[in-house]
Amino acid sequence: MNNPSTPSARRKARRFTLQALYQWQLAGAAVSDIEAQFLANQDFAKVDREYFHDLLHGVLGQVKTLDEQLTPYLDRRVEELSQVEKAILRLGAFELKERQDVPYRVVINEGIELAKVFGAEDSFKYVNGVLDKLARQLRYAEASERRPRD
């Protein structure tokens, strides 16, 4: 049996969270309805359910704040981002801000991987750049200690 706190279980939780955020952005359905739909999915068996719940509710509870934190690092308004990029960036911003137990490089890498799978051809580069800049702000000490000197 898969341990629900393994990296692959968390990766799956992020993937489902991205899909749930995308659905919420497009349809505006109640988060409880969206969550119930995903929990009933047969493919959800090896997902870290608690992490999925925390990410989904955390992002949706802080959308405005997350968008405000992302804005200085965007080359366009949040509303002009593709729905996939918007969901990935919000998810990454939430993890950078609230999940100090997850190294910032893991957060950025997971965002890149989601963008490669679900985003447009080069959206992973954009996601990487935005989340890297945000990490320097939100996790200054962690990002500074691991960066080579210029």
From Swiss-Prot:
**What NCBIfam families does the record tag this protein with?**
nusB
Q: Which organism is it from?
A: Alcanivorax borkumensis (strain ATCC 700651 / DSM 11573 / NCIMB 13689 / SK2)
- GO annotation, biological process: DNA-templated transcription termination; transcription antitermination
Gene3D superfamilies xref list: NusB-like
Q: Which GO terms describe its cellular component?
A: cytosol
Can the keyword Ubl conjugation be found in this entry's annotation? no
**Superkingdom assignment:** Bacteria
- What function does the entry list? Involved in transcription antitermination. Required for transcription of ribosomal RNA (rRNA) genes. Binds specifically to the boxA antiterminator sequence of the ribosomal RNA (rrn) operons.
Keyword Transcription tagged = yes
Q: Which UniProt keywords apply?
A: RNA-binding, Transcription, Transcription antitermination, Transcription regulation
Query: What GO MF annotations does this protein's record show?
Result: RNA binding
What family does this belong to?
Belongs to the NusB family.
**What is the designated name of this protein?**
Transcription antitermination protein NusB
InterPro entries per the record?
NusB-like_sf (IPR035926), NusB_fam (IPR011605), NusB_RsmB_TIM44 (IPR006027)
Record gene name:
nusB
